[in-house]
Amino acid sequence: MDKYDKIIDLTKRRGFLWNSFEIYGGIAGFFDYGPLGAILKNNVINTWRKHYIVNEGFYEIDSPTVTPYEVLKASGHVENFTDPLVECKGCLESFRADHIIEENVDVDTEGKTLQELQEMIEKNNIKCPKCGGEFKDVSTFNLMFATSIGPGGKRAAFMRPETAQGIFIQFKRISQFFRNKLPFGAVQIGKAYRNEISPRQGVIRLREFTQAEGEFFIDSRKKENFEKFESVKDTVLPLLSGKNQENESLSAEEKIVRMSLSDAVKNGIIAHEAIAYYIAVTKKFLMEIGIDESKLRFRQHLPNEMAHYAADCWDAELYTDRYGWIECVGIADRTNYDLLAHMKNSGEDLSVFVELDEEHEIEAYEIELNYKLVGRTFKGDAKVLEESLKELDDKKMEELVEALETEGKYTLKTCKRDFELLKEYLTAKKVKKIVKGEKIIPHVIEPSYGIDRITYCVMEHAFKEEEDRTVMGFSNAVSPIKVGVFPLVNKEGMPEIAMDLKNKLRENGLIAEYDDSGAIGRRYMRMDEVGTPFCITIDGETLVDNSVTIRERDSRAQFRIPINEVVSYIKDKL
């Protein structure tokens, strides 16, 4: 067995990970978290919350996983959320074209077109791995799970492919919550869905997975000189830039350069200080949850693999024994793509007013409504029309005035309804105004975390085989069970003392496990295997002087402390 198989065997035995729907044969791309796996995953998530909500000042929202078609049409997912597909002419089995090529030929398929993938399959005579048959031509496959809302299937929808869109849709409400003062950030943690063509990488490639995403909204002019960057500028990271990836004269080792974030920004490797800052936050989080620093690198997306919404993107990649480097975090500059797309398609104003350093004079349109005519025509919606006109930017106002002048009518789209405006409904004239600010569409820096992949890497990086034991060397932040409590023997009142201590630990918010079965060495080994950092033994000396033996997982060191100091000692260490 390789390391992956050993870890999966351990996680199944000890209640970390199980195949979903196992008694019905299972389905690829789905896993259940068992009792310890669920705690481990939640500890990863709660550590992430600490970094983004407590430390960074983001606030969390929770939106539906079912998303209407029009939302994902506007975001570009209907057109762009695809993978290349090949189907066998014989057995009709489907495969991801790029993966099937990489499994047969030592070549990088990232960013290749459908035609280029087709040529690779033909040139290398790649056949179906299941039956040996030939493939049909490479095509695209949309990865979203389609569904419908309500009876009759009249309202098309999808299971969300990312949590981010829920934040963008509620941008106006979120901005109001922050009193419309940039910059600010919102996060969402929850399930996302990707109908993978042929997931064959265990827990690495899932069809239902957990994302933790942050959306940091900022004035685009503030990205270059980002105030918080000063605190992380000297952080040194292993960077694999797009330029080095394309430099064929460099070896794989030479392509990765360790440098400070300040140098990376200064030399134009990282686009700006804002995205560099969240790369540093990502590294800090990964270190706290126990990722091996020697198995972490940050890789820049090449232009031909950049997401449709991104101006720059860096992946935190973690090394795994079986699958090599895998993408676990993406830190992207999404510009104002999403807000502009949803403004265009919803008719809602998603701009933010920002104050200028100095006042200045401008020319702007002033609208005067024919309230009698507008009230008679639009009745209760007249107020909606008035407010919508006030929110129009200069470009939209010019468009409206020109249409009324040349065509005598204009359709104003708002989130509530469309207004068919006639020339006689209003007058517009240009006036000079003193302005103290302007409306802008904020840009977005997005750190997006794949929690399931990260949780697996936490397990793999913690997994150690020693001569006489197997250890999950989890960091204290994420270990599922914090303390094992044992009576040395099941008599003389030791079980009662041990049980009482376990209860006190739990009352103080620490997950403690009582175990009185088998030799004490076997009990230590069981706790080592699930990553418990401390074990406490109640023995004969406890009955004499109220002291207990504490044993540390990693060093195996043992020492005694008074039983009434155990809770404070463990809490201090954790």
Swiss-Prot record:
Chain's role: Catalyzes the attachment of glycine to tRNA(Gly).
Keyword Aminoacyl-tRNA synthetase assigned: yes
Main location, first listed in the record: cytoplasm
Keywords on record: Aminoacyl-tRNA synthetase, ATP-binding, Cytoplasm, Ligase, Nucleotide-binding, Protein biosynthesis
Classification of source organism: Archaea, Methanobacteriati, Methanobacteriota, Methanomada group, Methanococci
Binding residues annotated for substrate, in chain numbering: R96, E162, F209, T210, Q211, A212, E213, E446, P447, S448, Y449, G450
Keyword Glycoprotein: no
One Gene Ontology cellular component annotation held by this UniProt entry: cytoplasm
Residues that span the membrane, as ranges: none
SUPFAM superfamilies linked to this entry: Class II aaRS ABD-related, Class II aaRS and biotin synthetases
Matches recorded under PROSITE patterns: AA_TRNA_LIGASE_II (PS50862)
Residues that, per the record, bind ATP: 194-196, 204-209, 327-328, 450-453
Record Gene3D superfamilies: 3.30.40.230, 3.30.720.200, Anticodon-binding domain, Bira Bifunctional Protein, Domain 2
EC number(s) per entry: 6.1.1.14
Catalytic activity: tRNA(Gly) + glycine + ATP = glycyl-tRNA(Gly) + AMP + diphosphate
Family as reported in the entry's similarity comment: Belongs to the class-II aminoacyl-tRNA synthetase family.
Recorded name of the encoding gene: glyS
Name of the protein in its database record: Glycine--tRNA ligase
Subcellular location(s) of the protein: Cytoplasm
GO biological process, one term: glycyl-tRNA aminoacylation
Gene Ontology molecular function, alphabetical: ATP binding; glycine-tRNA ligase activity; protein dimerization activity
Pfam families xref list: HGTP_anticodon, tRNA-synt_2b
